[in-house]
Protein backbone atom coordinates (compact mmCIF):
# COMPACT_ATOMS: atom_id res chain seq x y z
CA UNK A 1 0.00 0.00 0.00
CA UNK A 2 1.42 3.38 -0.98
CA UNK A 3 1.17 6.34 1.35
CA UNK A 4 0.69 9.84 -0.08
CA UNK A 5 3.40 12.39 0.63
CA UNK A 6 0.84 15.14 1.10
CA UNK A 7 -2.63 14.76 2.61
CA UNK A 8 -5.34 17.36 3.03
CA UNK A 9 -7.57 18.10 5.98
CA UNK A 10 -10.52 16.17 4.53
CA UNK A 11 -8.32 13.08 4.19
CA UNK A 12 -7.16 13.26 7.80
CA UNK A 13 -10.57 14.11 9.25
CA UNK A 14 -12.01 10.98 7.63
CA UNK A 15 -9.30 8.76 9.16
CA UNK A 16 -8.89 10.00 12.73
CA UNK A 17 -10.23 6.71 14.11
CA UNK A 18 -7.81 4.48 12.19
CA UNK A 19 -5.73 2.54 14.68
CA UNK A 20 -2.66 2.38 12.44
CA UNK A 21 -2.44 6.17 12.20
CA UNK A 22 0.14 8.03 14.26
CA UNK A 23 -0.41 11.79 14.17
CA UNK A 24 2.39 14.05 15.37
CA UNK A 25 2.49 17.78 16.03
CA UNK A 26 6.04 18.86 15.11
CA UNK A 27 5.77 22.56 15.97
CA UNK A 28 8.82 24.52 17.07
CA UNK A 29 8.90 28.28 17.52
CA UNK A 30 11.69 30.52 16.21
CA UNK A 31 11.98 33.76 18.16
CA UNK A 32 14.26 36.52 16.75
CA UNK A 33 17.36 36.91 18.89
CA UNK A 34 20.08 39.58 18.49
CA UNK A 35 22.86 37.15 19.40
CA UNK A 36 21.74 33.78 17.99
CA UNK A 37 19.78 35.09 14.95
CA UNK A 38 16.87 32.97 16.16
CA UNK A 39 16.12 31.32 19.47
CA UNK A 40 14.35 27.99 19.12
CA UNK A 41 11.57 27.31 21.60
CA UNK A 42 9.50 24.19 22.06
CA UNK A 43 6.03 24.15 20.55
CA UNK A 44 4.79 21.90 23.33
CA UNK A 45 2.85 24.72 25.08
CA UNK A 46 0.97 25.31 21.80
CA UNK A 47 0.23 21.57 21.55
CA UNK A 48 -1.03 21.53 25.14
CA UNK A 49 -3.47 24.35 24.33
CA UNK A 50 -4.93 22.39 21.43
CA UNK A 51 -4.06 19.88 18.73
CA UNK A 52 -5.55 17.52 16.16
CA UNK A 53 -7.40 14.77 18.06
CA UNK A 54 -5.01 11.96 18.94
CA UNK A 55 -1.87 13.88 18.00
CA UNK A 56 1.22 13.39 20.13
CA UNK A 57 3.95 16.01 20.37
CA UNK A 58 7.39 15.59 18.77
CA UNK A 59 10.19 17.61 20.36
CA UNK A 60 12.45 18.35 17.41
CA UNK A 61 15.18 20.16 19.30
CA UNK A 62 15.07 17.71 22.19
CA UNK A 63 14.39 14.04 21.54
CA UNK A 64 15.09 14.27 17.81
CA UNK A 65 18.38 16.20 17.90
CA UNK A 66 21.98 15.42 18.74
CA UNK A 67 22.39 17.81 21.65
CA UNK A 68 26.16 17.26 21.75
CA UNK A 69 26.83 18.67 18.27
CA UNK A 70 26.94 22.35 19.20
CA UNK A 71 24.36 23.09 16.49
CA UNK A 72 20.59 23.21 16.76
CA UNK A 73 18.54 20.39 15.25
CA UNK A 74 21.49 18.18 14.28
CA UNK A 75 20.45 14.75 13.04
CA UNK A 76 20.95 12.19 15.84
CA UNK A 77 22.48 8.76 15.44
CA UNK A 78 20.37 5.92 14.05
CA UNK A 79 20.13 4.29 17.48
CA UNK A 80 19.12 7.57 19.14
CA UNK A 81 16.48 8.24 16.51
CA UNK A 82 15.09 4.71 16.64
CA UNK A 83 14.78 4.88 20.42
CA UNK A 84 13.02 8.25 20.23
CA UNK A 85 10.53 7.09 17.60
CA UNK A 86 9.90 3.84 19.48
CA UNK A 87 9.08 5.86 22.60
CA UNK A 88 6.72 8.03 20.55
CA UNK A 89 4.87 4.91 19.44
CA UNK A 90 5.86 4.65 15.79
CA UNK A 91 6.54 1.21 14.35
CA UNK A 92 6.80 -0.49 10.98
CA UNK A 93 3.05 -1.09 10.65
CA UNK A 94 2.04 2.49 11.40
CA UNK A 95 1.38 5.44 9.11
CA UNK A 96 2.77 8.72 10.42
CA UNK A 97 0.94 11.96 9.62
CA UNK A 98 2.89 15.08 10.49
CA UNK A 99 1.78 18.67 10.88
CA UNK A 100 3.04 21.88 12.43
CA UNK A 101 1.96 25.42 13.19
CA UNK A 102 3.57 28.52 11.73
CA UNK A 103 5.18 26.72 8.82
CA UNK A 104 5.08 23.29 7.21
CA UNK A 105 8.86 23.09 7.42
CA UNK A 106 8.81 21.61 10.95
CA UNK A 107 6.68 18.77 9.64
CA UNK A 108 8.88 18.34 6.56
CA UNK A 109 11.95 18.21 8.81
CA UNK A 110 10.54 15.17 10.61
CA UNK A 111 9.38 13.73 7.26
CA UNK A 112 12.94 13.99 5.94
CA UNK A 113 14.42 12.46 9.10
CA UNK A 114 12.05 9.51 8.88
CA UNK A 115 12.92 8.97 5.22
CA UNK A 116 16.64 9.31 5.96
CA UNK A 117 16.25 6.47 8.43
CA UNK A 118 14.34 4.28 5.99
CA UNK A 119 10.71 4.93 6.98
CA UNK A 120 8.40 5.79 4.07
CA UNK A 121 4.94 5.39 5.61
CA UNK A 122 4.76 9.09 6.32
CA UNK A 123 2.61 11.99 5.10
CA UNK A 124 2.56 15.74 5.72
CA UNK A 125 -0.73 17.53 6.40
CA UNK A 126 -1.07 20.29 3.81
CA UNK A 127 -1.77 23.62 5.47
CA UNK A 128 -0.96 22.24 8.90
CA UNK A 129 -2.52 23.54 12.08
CA UNK A 130 -3.61 26.84 10.55
CA UNK A 131 -5.75 25.19 7.89
CA UNK A 132 -7.16 22.63 10.31
CA UNK A 133 -8.34 25.30 12.74
CA UNK A 134 -9.47 27.74 10.03
CA UNK A 135 -11.88 25.05 8.87
CA UNK A 136 -13.14 24.58 12.44
CA UNK A 137 -12.05 20.97 12.57
CA UNK A 138 -12.18 19.16 15.94
CA UNK A 139 -9.49 20.13 18.43
CA UNK A 140 -8.31 18.18 21.46
CA UNK A 141 -6.58 19.39 24.65
CA UNK A 142 -5.91 15.98 26.22
CA UNK A 143 -2.20 15.18 26.52
CA UNK A 144 -2.19 12.41 23.95
CA UNK A 145 0.49 9.74 23.67
CA UNK A 146 0.76 6.44 21.81
CA UNK A 147 1.89 3.13 23.34
CA UNK A 148 5.58 2.43 22.83
CA UNK A 149 6.42 0.59 19.61
CA UNK A 150 9.49 -0.84 17.90
CA UNK A 151 11.10 1.42 15.31
CA UNK A 152 14.03 0.05 13.34
CA UNK A 153 16.27 2.54 11.54
CA UNK A 154 17.64 1.72 8.09
CA UNK A 155 19.88 4.71 7.28
CA UNK A 156 19.94 6.16 3.77
CA UNK A 157 23.23 8.08 3.81
CA UNK A 158 22.65 9.60 0.36
CA UNK A 159 19.84 11.75 1.79
CA UNK A 160 22.20 13.42 4.26
CA UNK A 161 24.92 15.76 2.95
CA UNK A 162 28.00 16.61 4.97
CA UNK A 163 30.23 19.67 4.83
CA UNK A 164 32.95 18.05 2.73
CA UNK A 165 30.46 16.90 0.10
CA UNK A 166 28.95 20.38 -0.08
CA UNK A 167 32.38 21.93 -0.54
CA UNK A 168 33.09 19.52 -3.40
CA UNK A 169 29.69 20.35 -4.90
CA UNK A 170 30.62 24.03 -5.26
CA UNK A 171 32.80 23.10 -8.23
CA UNK A 172 30.79 20.14 -9.57
CA UNK A 173 28.80 20.67 -12.77
CA UNK A 174 26.30 17.88 -12.08
CA UNK A 175 25.25 18.97 -8.57
CA UNK A 176 22.69 21.66 -7.76
CA UNK A 177 23.14 23.38 -4.41
CA UNK A 178 19.85 25.00 -3.42
CA UNK A 179 19.52 27.70 -0.76
CA UNK A 180 16.02 27.70 0.77
CA UNK A 181 16.41 31.03 2.58
CA UNK A 182 14.95 34.35 1.45
CA UNK A 183 16.43 36.26 -1.47
CA UNK A 184 17.82 38.98 0.79
CA UNK A 185 19.49 36.37 2.96
CA UNK A 186 20.89 34.68 -0.16
CA UNK A 187 22.39 37.89 -1.52
CA UNK A 188 23.73 38.93 1.88
CA UNK A 189 21.59 42.07 2.07
CA UNK A 190 19.57 40.88 5.06
CA UNK A 191 20.66 41.69 8.60
CA UNK A 192 19.49 38.19 9.52
CA UNK A 193 22.29 35.74 8.83
CA UNK A 194 24.17 32.86 10.42
CA UNK A 195 27.51 34.43 11.26
CA UNK A 196 28.52 35.58 7.79
CA UNK A 197 26.01 37.04 5.29
CA UNK A 198 25.58 35.47 1.87
CA UNK A 199 25.39 32.01 0.36
CA UNK A 200 27.51 28.97 -0.44
CA UNK A 201 29.29 29.51 -3.79
CA UNK A 202 27.50 28.17 -6.91
CA UNK A 203 24.22 27.69 -5.06
CA UNK A 204 20.91 28.84 -6.52
CA UNK A 205 18.17 30.44 -4.48
CA UNK A 206 14.75 28.78 -4.23
CA UNK A 207 13.13 30.32 -1.13
CA UNK A 208 10.92 27.83 0.66
CA UNK A 209 8.26 30.53 0.95
CA UNK A 210 8.01 30.66 -2.85
CA UNK A 211 6.76 27.07 -2.81
CA UNK A 212 3.72 27.64 -0.60
CA UNK A 213 0.58 29.73 -0.66
CA UNK A 214 1.29 32.03 2.27
CA UNK A 215 -2.40 32.72 2.85
CA UNK A 216 -3.27 29.06 3.42
CA UNK A 217 0.13 27.51 4.31
CA UNK A 218 -0.49 24.91 1.59
CA UNK A 219 1.99 23.82 -1.06
CA UNK A 220 1.48 25.33 -4.48
CA UNK A 221 0.11 23.06 -7.24
CA UNK A 222 2.59 20.68 -8.86
CA UNK A 223 2.70 22.66 -12.11
CA UNK A 224 3.69 25.82 -10.23
CA UNK A 225 6.30 23.98 -8.16
CA UNK A 226 7.75 22.52 -11.33
CA UNK A 227 7.95 25.96 -12.97
CA UNK A 228 9.79 27.50 -10.00
CA UNK A 229 12.26 24.64 -9.62
CA UNK A 230 12.82 24.21 -13.34
CA UNK A 231 13.50 27.93 -13.73
CA UNK A 232 16.23 27.58 -11.09
CA UNK A 233 17.76 24.66 -13.01
CA UNK A 234 17.22 22.22 -10.18
CA UNK A 235 15.11 19.53 -11.84
CA UNK A 236 17.73 18.65 -14.45
CA UNK A 237 20.61 18.27 -11.98
CA UNK A 238 22.14 14.86 -11.42
CA UNK A 239 22.29 15.42 -7.66
CA UNK A 240 20.49 18.00 -5.57
CA UNK A 241 21.56 19.21 -2.14
CA UNK A 242 19.39 21.70 -0.27
CA UNK A 243 20.46 23.90 2.63
CA UNK A 244 19.25 26.85 4.69
CA UNK A 245 20.26 28.22 8.08
CA UNK A 246 19.88 25.09 10.18
CA UNK A 247 18.52 22.29 8.01
CA UNK A 248 14.83 23.08 8.46
CA UNK A 249 13.55 25.15 5.51
CA UNK A 250 15.83 23.04 3.30
CA UNK A 251 13.63 20.02 4.01
CA UNK A 252 10.63 21.96 2.67
CA UNK A 253 12.37 22.33 -0.69
CA UNK A 254 13.35 18.64 -0.59
CA UNK A 255 9.70 17.80 0.09
CA UNK A 256 8.51 19.90 -2.87
CA UNK A 257 11.00 18.07 -5.09
CA UNK A 258 9.70 14.75 -3.76
CA UNK A 259 6.19 15.82 -4.78
CA UNK A 260 7.59 16.12 -8.30
CA UNK A 261 9.18 12.67 -8.17
CA UNK A 262 12.70 13.57 -6.99
CA UNK A 263 13.02 11.37 -3.91
CA UNK A 264 16.84 11.35 -3.98
CA UNK A 265 17.42 14.90 -2.73
CA UNK A 266 19.97 15.35 0.05
CA UNK A 267 19.77 17.94 2.82
CA UNK A 268 22.90 19.59 4.23
CA UNK A 269 22.07 19.09 7.87
CA UNK A 270 24.51 21.63 9.34
CA UNK A 271 23.63 24.20 6.67
CA UNK A 272 24.88 27.76 7.14
CA UNK A 273 25.04 27.38 10.93
CA UNK A 274 27.92 24.98 10.42
CA UNK A 275 29.32 26.45 7.19
CA UNK A 276 29.60 30.05 8.40
CA UNK A 277 31.29 28.97 11.63
CA UNK A 278 34.25 27.66 9.63
CA UNK A 279 36.25 30.66 8.35
CA UNK A 280 38.11 28.46 5.87
CA UNK A 281 34.91 27.91 3.89
CA UNK A 282 33.90 30.44 1.21
CA UNK A 283 30.80 32.63 1.27
CA UNK A 284 29.55 34.75 -1.63
CA UNK A 285 27.28 37.78 -1.73
CA UNK A 286 25.09 39.01 -4.53
PLM features: what roles do these ranges have?
Residues 1-286:
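Cytosolic catalytic domains that perform sulfur/thiol-centered chemistry
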Amino acid sequence: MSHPLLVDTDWLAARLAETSLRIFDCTTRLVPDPVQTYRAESGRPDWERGHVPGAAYVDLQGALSDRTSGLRFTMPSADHFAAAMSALGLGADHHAVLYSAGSNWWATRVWWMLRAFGFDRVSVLDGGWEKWTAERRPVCTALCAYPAAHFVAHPRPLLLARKDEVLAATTADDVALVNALTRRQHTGESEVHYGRPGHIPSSVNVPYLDLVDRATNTFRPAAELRAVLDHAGVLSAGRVITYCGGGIAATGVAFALALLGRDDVAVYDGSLSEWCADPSLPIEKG
